[in-house]
């Protein structure tokens, strides 16, 4: 205990867009036929998220979400345009690239969101670009936007809404993108002879996920499965590193559970990442966080293995892993351990894990060949 005085966080000042910037943004938006907004991590809190939804509906603008920010817009909303993780699905990305106006709202922009600085292209985008970010020093650092607005994203959205909607009929464009997005998020079951394809597990988890669950993911190719197939709402939180740093999955889940008690907490980790910081499971058990930890175990550093297949086919070096029994490992911390070794065990095991009151660890022996939803190791090596 401490006798130090407890103080609340200092409220940060929020600035809105200038009248000139508002008028220019309105003019650009109302004249666009195929606008696309990318909403980033500064879209947070109920009011800001509600403003984003109202903006999408009022101006008839489809909304995409970047890597690890998939909760900022309801993935089942009619104006959902899809997700921009690392290596976004080509059919969806190609359609997005036909936009005639991009808006980046509440995201500074980086290699993941921009698909390695190709969307928007750096330094000069292929499309007119409006970039909304509070720090003026960030605007123009990577891209030369048509209009850069240094202001709070929530204030931008509310100012635009106060000015009213209007513009061209974009219902066809919105539906075209939304249909492509829904197609990408539709899982077509496949099987493999080297383990469970992780999509089967994701589909079952989706049936048990609450609308306000905290979802975290570690770094690795396994994360492409929940990133592509797990539906999220604005009441969820989706946490994880936006680039390739391994290890945040379990600590993020513990922090999410401790800071928002009473919410469902679901974490995804690969076997490599969970061996780095998974010991924080002890903290979850100690403080009663009912964490459900799903470990995708392919006995490899899967992402590095994918790059080896692409750049040095047939030359596997230092990516194979000798792993513990993760179900027993989880039980050693006081969690309930589960193991999935084939597809027939998925539904029952996932249901049992969610039914368990406390922390649970679910190890799935997944296919290494099915390295992501879009390709296999065999296909990469033969290409």
Name what the model sees in each region.
Residues 1-16, 112-116, 343-383:
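Glycine/aspartate-rich loop-and-adjacent alpha/beta segment that forms the canonical ThDP
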Residues 1-31, 185-188:
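Conformationally flexible catalytic loops at phosphate/diphosphate-handling active centers
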Residues 15, 95-99, 148, 156, ...:
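Conserved thiamine diphosphate
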Residues 21-35, 55, 95-99, 204-211, ...:
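Glycine-rich phosphate/diphosphate-binding loops that line cofactor/substrate pockets in enzymes
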Residues 69-176, 350:
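Glycine-rich, acidic loop regions that bind phosphate or pyrophosphate groups
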Residues 91-111, 224-301:
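Thiamine diphosphate
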Residues 147-157, 279-297, 373-378:
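A short alpha/beta connector and helix-capping loop motif
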Residues 178-260:
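Active-site diphosphate/adenylate-binding microenvironment
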């Amino acid at each position: 205990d401490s006798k130090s005085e407890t103080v609340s966080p200092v409220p940060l000042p929020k600035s809105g867009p200038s009248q000139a910037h508002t008028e220019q943004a309105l003019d650009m938006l109302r004249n666009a036929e195929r606008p696309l907004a990318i909403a980033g991590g500064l879209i947070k809190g109920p009011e800001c998220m509600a403003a984003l939804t109202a903006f999408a509906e009022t101006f008839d603008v489809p909304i995409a979400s970047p890597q690890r920010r998939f909760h900022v817009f309801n993935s089942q909303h009619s104006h959902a345009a899809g997700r921009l993780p690392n290596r976004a699905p080509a059919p969806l990305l190609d359609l997005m690239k036909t936009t005639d106006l991009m808006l980046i709202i509440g995201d500074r922009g980086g290699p993941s969101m921009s698909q390695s600085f190709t969307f928007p292209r750096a330094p000069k985008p292929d499309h007119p670009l409006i970039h909304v970010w509070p720090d003026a020093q960030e605007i123009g650092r990577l891209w030369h936007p048509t209009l850069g607005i240094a202001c709070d994203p929530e204030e931008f959205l509310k100012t635009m809404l106060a000015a009213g909607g209007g513009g061209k009929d974009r219902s066809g464009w919105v539906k075209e993108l939304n249909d492509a997005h829904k197609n990408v998020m539709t899982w077509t079951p496949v099987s493999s002879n080297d383990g469970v394809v992780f999509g089967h597990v994701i589909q079952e988890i989706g049936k048990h996920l609450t609308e306000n669950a905290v979802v975290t993911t570690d770094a690795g190719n396994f994360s492409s499965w929940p990133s592509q197939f797990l539906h999220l709402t604005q009441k969820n939180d989706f946490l994880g590193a936006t680039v390739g740093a391994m290890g945040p999955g379990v600590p993020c889940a513990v922090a999410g559970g401790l800071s928002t008690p009473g919410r469902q907490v679901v974490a995804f980790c690969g076997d490599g990442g969970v061996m780095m910081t998974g010991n924080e499971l002890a903290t979850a058990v100690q403080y009663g966080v009912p964490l459900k930890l799903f470990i995708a175990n392919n006995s490899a550093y899967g992402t590095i293995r994918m790059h080896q297949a692409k750049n040095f086919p047939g030359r596997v070096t230092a990516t194979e892993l000798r792993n513990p029994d993760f179900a027993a490992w989880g039980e050693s911390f006081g969690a309930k351990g589960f193991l999935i070794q084939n597809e027939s065990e998925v539904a029952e095991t996932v249901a049992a894990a969610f039914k368990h009151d406390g922390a649970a660890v679910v190890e799935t022996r997944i296919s290494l060949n099915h390295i992501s939803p879009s390709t296999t190791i065999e296909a990469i090596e033969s290409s």
